[in-house]
């Protein structure tokens, strides 16, 4: 495999798709040696097939606001790879959504889902619609309009979307209601549903919970644990909320959250009512974290900056892609942390990842450390299929087992001769080999 030639061809086909090209390059560099040991892969152009989505669906979404004005957004569904199961991946509603971002997310999702050990392919979708400042009625009308096209392309054995940025329980409910009305079928076609209509326990917290289980396993490789460690978290949505809850439960102290407006530093620790308040911030729709300072005296709001300048033992990106760059990595490395994990999808730039690995920092890539969300979505699919609902304890135990298994796969493929575990390489190779073997078995399709 010639990585540079493949990337040159991709860049010519997909100019300007920076996020997608970044994600592909990272994986290709990691798997190059292993790929070259399998000439049968080259014969069937496996890489060339793997890096292109199987299908991209694009559609207009016309809807009417509360004043009667018509708006038109763009809807997408990228069905990236279905070799090991139905396409599975979230829907994102945010003005930044474009094809490059969704292709990168779908590509990453393919390997992340493979790591979970569950039979799920990779996909991603969404729209450039923003829920910010919109009424419940407007959000409902948009979701219904979005589903009037999407329903043709999804199903419990075909493609099972979930939530992502801008798509929480409310939006999933509206989407599911419209799907049911259009198809006259009550199926497990979406995950992240409410408990009253087929959802799974701990799904909202699952990404954060799973991340802390993974970090716990990483620290254990160096004889450490989370207890009494300080933790800097970015974001204040579901991922950050779940991470803060589980970190506190495991004895750690969360000292930061952040938003587009800046970050909160709370030396006393973000626990109890403070964690619950994160949900209020999210549900306000204002996308700011400054009100936390007013609510909890003693905390400090730092305007326009990211929390990476705060000294902590553990750093977790929980907001969005590429939120931690090379300069941020230098700042973090100077603090001599125990662990860094990109709990958000591709939360670190390529430069930042390279710096962490070069410094032999304990570093967890998103496709491994944040797989708890989609793993629990897979468990929701299973519960829907067998018409049963598991207890919180049962789901949490299964999630813990899955994250332990993912960690074992990363160590198997990522441990170097000198003992350092390159989790980026390990996760990429483990996910790739499962998908590649499935594609080989199914022929050139």
Where are these regions (language model features)?
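Conserved active-site and cofactor/substrate-binding residues in soluble primary-metabolism enzymes
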Residues: 1, 15, 19-22, 26, ...
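Flexible, glycine/charged-enriched surface loops at secondary-structure junctions
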Residues: 21, 37-44, 117, 154-163, ...
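Glycine/serine-rich phosphate-binding loop and adjoining beta1-alpha1 elements at the start
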Residues: 94, 113-227
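Glycine-rich phosphate/diphosphate-binding loop of Rossmann-like nucleotide-binding domains
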Residues: 191-194, 199-309
